[in-house]
Amino acid sequence: MLTLDEMIERKKLLGYSNRDIAAMSGVPLGTVQKIFSGATQKPHLQTMILLDDLLSKDPKRQGEFTVEDYMALPDDRRVELIDGIIYDMAAPTKLHQSLIGAIFVPFYNYLLEHEDRDCEILLSPVDVQLDADNRTMIQPDLVGLSYRGAEDPRHVDQRRIFGAPDFILEVLSPSSSSRDCILKLHKYQAAGCGEYWIVDPEHERVTVYRFRDKVLLDAPIQYTFQDQIAVALSDDQLIIDFAKIRRQLHRYYK
């Protein structure tokens, strides 16, 4: 078993904070802090075994991470896991959040007016485990689900969605643009998503992809922030008026 001094060196080498160690080992944060500060002179053997088990291991490399590793991360670290690679997510801008909110409202109002439709629209952060893939957990900006009763192969609980949503929307940011436009596009199509919108606030564009049985139905359609766009999830009854949204967000486009 590692000595305390060796654990301290491993902690530095691995770049773990006390919070990281508590989350990954299951040892309470207060106990971890006392051990590594020297406040606790004789920690319990079982506690040291848990810490030794964590700190003795070589850290996984990108491409080797699983959903279990993702779930063990501290709650205040926002990341996505795609094909075993962990991507840190930058804090969203005010424009990013305002756009998502402005798009969410008509969705929500539509569902209030159409209670017969067993649908749900969810704002990020919500975990989506595509195809129950153990190496992928994504947090789209907006997720739409149309429930199919007992025949629905997907599963939704209080923590995550297992399977492909019917509607996904991502708002681009400088740090996520290539991931949203290339990597996630491929993942969403391969998992069986029905519709994927990419909203580009910088160039005021919306690109819409529609899929059926994992096949792109037609060429993607590009719209501007002056257009109205029908939502396939609503059988094209719901129209998102981007010209109206653009007017609402005029302070960001001076």
Name each model-derived stretch:
Residues 2-16, 23-24, 29-30, 34-39, ...:
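Gly/Pro/Ser/Thr-rich low-complexity, intrinsically disordered segments predominantly at protein N-termini
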